[in-house]
Design a protein with these regions (language model features):
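Conserved phosphate-donor/acceptor-positioning beta-strand/loop module used by diverse small-molecule
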Residues: 76-100, 133-134, 176-182
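The conserved Walker
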Residues: 10
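Conserved nucleotide-sensing/catalytic segment adjacent to the nucleotide-binding pocket
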Residues: 24-73
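Post-Walker A alpha-helix
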Residues: 17-18
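Hydrophobic anchor at the beta1->P-loop junction of P-loop NTPases
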Residues: 6
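Switch/connector loops and helix/strand junctions flanking conserved nucleotide-binding motifs
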Residues: 61-63, 89-96, 104, 122, ...
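C-terminal accessory "lid"/substrate-recognition subdomains
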Residues: 113-182
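Conserved glycine(s) of the Walker
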Residues: 13
Length: 182
């Protein structure tokens, strides 16, 4: 079994990474507390070979729980990797300004203050991560491609093409992107 723990700075692309892995047939769980990681893996062990978990580690207790869970999984012969997504502070601030959402650690201060607090809290986790990916210069599509490169065994999704014959009197297919009348 392969387990990827997706974590990192808020706004660096954790959700995007989770979506990419989910589209590549990984079993993905978002916002899982670190204490629930081990029970989850035991629950899905026979059903899924590839599991990705998005964990938000913003407290010391969560970091210690994650370290314990990771050690327990390695004892169970589970291949566990931590993917830490990072980005430059000014980029994170710009992303939060664009979405007009407050940073989770902002606490009434400036967005930059929240980013600084989070970077301080996640410093130890970044140091222990197996893969650190800087998303500063990446857009959503480039991040998806980069995740695909990092996890080379991802299926090549390529282009999906369906040809369908239909009659106009029955209506146009709802999921059609292009319709040719020949």
């Amino acid at each position: 079994m392969e387990v990827v723990i997706i974590t990192g700075m808020s706004g660096a692309g954790r959700s995007t990474a989770a979506h990419v892995l989910e589209d590549s047939n990984w079993y993905v769980v978002d916002n899982l507390p670190p204490a629930m990681l081990l029970p989850l893996i035991k629950e899905v062990e026979g059903e899924h070979q590839k599991v990705a978990v998005v964990i938000d580690v913003r407290s010391r207790a969560f970091f210690e729980e994650l370290a314990q869970s990771r050690a327990a999984l390695k004892q169970m012969q589970v291949n566990v990797r931590i993917l830490f997504l990072d980005s430059a502070d000014e980029i994170l601030v710009r992303r939060y300004e664009a979405t007009r959402r407050p940073h989770p650690l902002q606490a009434g201060d400036r967005i930059f203050d929240g980013v600084t607090r989070e970077r301080k809290l996640l410093g130890d986790l970044r140091a222990t991560a197996d893969i650190v990916l800087d998303t500063s210069a990446l857009n959503v599509h480039q991040l998806g491609n980069k995740i695909g490169e990092v996890f080379a065994q991802l299926s090549d999704r390529g282009i999906h093409l369906s040809l369908l014959s239909f009659g106009y009197k029955y209506g146009i297919p709802y999921d059609a992107d292009f319709i040719l009348d020949c």
